[in-house]
């Protein structure tokens, strides 16, 4: 176990102390790895928030409205007092 630890430590020290100055790429291929900000923006098009919603959001009261339309008493009350009041009077549950 000590031998393995010692070999790992020596390998790490050799890696840290090695001369890495010649590791930088040279030539025309090295410039292809990087691009300017303008070229990067052309590649990645961000979603614009101001273009409008893609799908309108559903009405949260639609299931309640459909249920109240099926009951004639609730439908009549909703025409007179509003959907929330009619639903509360008929079913006794707040929306």
UniProtKB/Swiss-Prot annotation:
Domain of life: Eukaryota
Binding positions for Ca(2+) 2 per the UniProt entry: 66, 69
Family: Belongs to the osteocalcin/matrix Gla protein family.
Domain Gla: start-end pairs: 46-92
GO molecular function: calcium ion binding
Designated name of the protein: Osteocalcin-related protein
Residues modified to 4-carboxyglutamate: 66, 69
UniProtKB keywords: Biomineralization, Calcium, Cleavage on pair of basic residues, Disulfide bond, Gamma-carboxyglutamic acid, Metal-binding, Secreted, Signal
Organism name: Mus musculus (Mouse)
Task of the protein: Binds strongly to apatite and calcium.
Compartments, record wording: Secreted
């Amino acid at each position: 176990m000590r031998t393995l630890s010692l070999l790992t430590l020596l390998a790490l020290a050799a890696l840290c102390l090695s001369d890495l100055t010649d590791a930088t790429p040279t030539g025309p291929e090295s410039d292809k790895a990087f691009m300017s900000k303008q070229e990067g923006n052309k590649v990645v098009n961000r979603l614009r928030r101001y273009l409008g919603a893609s799908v309108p959001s559903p009405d949260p009261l639609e299931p309640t409205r459909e249920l109240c339309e099926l009951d004639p008493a609730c439908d009549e009350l909703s025409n007179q007092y509003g959907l929330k009041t009619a639903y509360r009077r008929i079913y006794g549950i707040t929306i």
